[in-house]
Amino acid sequence: RTAKYEKKEAIRLEKYEKKEAAYRKKHPDSPSAPVKKKKRKFQTLEDYLPIEKIANGIVYTTDHRYVKILEIEPINFLLRSAREQQSIIYSFISYLKISPVKLQIKMISKKADINRHLEQSAKELERESDPRCRELQRDYIQFVRHLSSREAVSRRFFLIFEYEPFNVNRKTEEKEILAALETAAQTAKTFLYQCGNDVVMHENEDEFTTDVLYTLLNRTLCTDKPLPERITEVLGQRMAEGKDVDTIHCNAFTAPESLDLKHSNYVRINGLYHTYLMVPSDGYKNKVTPGWLSLLINAGEGIDIDFYLHKQPKDKIQQRLGQQIRINRSKIKDASDTNSDFDDLDSAIRSGYFLKAGLANNEDFYYMNLLITITASDLEELQWRIQEMKKLLISQDMDLRSCYFLQEQGFRSSLPLASLDKKLYELSKRNVLTTGAAS
């Protein structure tokens, strides 16, 4: 056995030496020892989030952008008369003409927390002396409890934009950036007030911004553990570990406890299932009515909407539009009117002239993207909600597709940082004029 083993070992060493000699002959400059692969760097959830710090009511991102988040009080647009709706749209058009180039409008929905309201109603009931009024108040409390058990949903709306430098080559100081963002926020407040919307003012803007991120990343945790409790808990853990509390990163308070990105069609955050869907470029209707997004906004609990608008340079678009119309007109001459290509080309030419007329009528050209986030406590409920959402959009002649193998990009794009992933942007961008965007 020993002789046989030694013979095998000798053959193995001989083969190894031949391979080594052949490798040296082919790569004379390379070292003989094989290069070790670099170990993958361990990344915590705090490091993963693209946020450097939150200060002065602004989010400083890791890619050196400055983002402002405004909370907007909504109005019930569908209950307004046709004349009022038209007036609101024109007021919003006025804002879009002077708004930042990139805008993100975010809507988050979750089950309404009515405990505070019920506590206040109970206190008023105790103070009431009239027995008939007490009876009415008891009925009201019972009605609110019954209603909240089935369909009570609270919605919050946010307008997000970033600082846009006037001159890219010039270095801008931080105080100039803060002043520019504050001016943009005041402009938004003035014009949205004309639409009937109020911008919610907060005593501590940093705390508000941190709370928004904490609520988004910790859907279930934020109801049981508000942000002040979370901050106290994290600080206590750091002190117990003997770490410096003064240098703690803001992501330590907002980061979720667990984040699972291993699946192709969903993301798990703190055990809650999130899936991201998009309306593809060809999934929109050609004509829209005022308030056409209300259907998605009122879809129910666990449905979040991210609406992106990216204004394009007018002169470049007009040049490209004229060029494309000329190309399509030359193509249609060679196509027969019985071919399916003829209808597509005819539609493209008509759309081109429509956009050309709109631009000549002082409208702006935008690329619009629509990202939908669906959350559920288990996979079965998640699949049911996805199917129901797709049916809802099909009923309105719209299409909806899951972001397969792009869930991580969907997660990062859904953060209130006015940053849509490039691949998702290309897959879902749709051209729209100011009137369509404002509707």
Residue ranges and their predicted role:
Residues 1-438:
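Extended, folded cores of ATP/NTP-driven motor/assembly subunits in large transport
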